[in-house]
C-alpha cells in the first residue's frame, strides 16, 4: 500500500505549473517534502489530501482514487493538517481533538471515540491542558493540539503542511520527536512539508525534493544529503558535514 501520483498536474497560469508529477510514497515511516519556496510542496500535499483539485493525472491512497472516492471513505484512511487553521478560540483542547473523530462519529461521539480522543491527547502530552481554551495556550501547545486532532482521526496516512511554522527550536524538536513516535509506535505513515533540511534528514526515512513544480530527487536522507544535490535543489551553496548525530547541511 502506498500513496501514488501519476502524471499529476496543477496549472495556475501559462507560466506557473506544478507537475506533471509521478512518484510513489511507500507506506510506513516519515517522508519529508523539501525544496525552495514555490517549489510546489504544499500544493502536492493538499492535492493528495483532496483539499485542492488536480487538473490532470491520478492520485491513489491505499489503492483508493482520491478524486473519485467518497469523502467519507478517504477521511477514514487519510488526515490532513494545513498550514493555516481557523478554529474558534473558545474551544478547549479536548473539543478540538474531538473534531478528529467527525468522519467516524458525524458529531455524535461514542465511548470508542472518546477513547481515541484521550489516547491522542495523552500521546501529545496534553492531558494537563485538555480543558484549557485554545487562546490560553502557547503557540507550541496549540500546534500539538492540532496534531492530536489529526491523530485522533486514526488514519493510516497523516499529511502535515509545515507544522513547525512559528515554533521555536525547543518546540520544533519536540514536535518532530512526537511525529517520529507516531510513525514508529502507532504505525502511521507521516508525510510532512518541512523547510529545514536538517530536520528532514534527522527524522525522516525518505526525502522527496521538489523544485520548480517538479520532483527532482526522491531517496533516503543519505542520498539527498550530498553537497551537489542540495546545492542544486536550493540554488545556494550547501556543504554537508558529519555532525554528532548524522549529516548536517551548512549553508550560512
Place the predicted regions along the sequence by residue.
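Conserved ABC ATPase "signature" region
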Residues: 98, 111-129, 154, 159
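Conserved ABC ATPase signature
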Residues: 133-137, 141
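ABC ATPase nucleotide-binding domains
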Residues: 233-252
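Conserved ABC transporter NBD signature motif
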Residues: 57-65, 73-74
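Helix-to-loop junction immediately C-terminal to a conserved catalytic motif
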Residues: 49
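The feature captures the beta-strand-to-loop junction immediately N-terminal to the Walker
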Residues: 34-36
